[in-house]
């Protein structure tokens, strides 16, 4: 089965399931061999700019059709059976609607699987859903069990209450 992943976390899941995608997002760099796969999209944003400039570029890109550009020629050449996308954030990765439009425009017979986790449990559920769809349900269950054991081991080593922590997602404008 030919799979394209447009989400770094999905790429990691695929490799954990023993599936090497035929194409990935420009941001997929783990495991290291993912970085050698064809990228089917690129960003219209200058990642070397400061956070205020990036925010301005993102707003302009949204007004001008999106933050990411799909390399339709590469996507067509890869002719995937399945494309893993995301539905969480319009600026974090290629929008689900954009990839569905590209699939339709190119006449590809590819199923788009959308990942939309809002919690760690949702991510683990996505792993199993992906495993079932790609005929790796036993491997997905095993990977999930290993991850849950690691989570439990870490939880057992941490105090019940810890310091209050705020995470700054972005500096300009401030996003907590």
Kindly label every feature range from the protein language model.
Residues 1-176:
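N-terminal ligand-binding lobe of clamshell/alpha-beta domains
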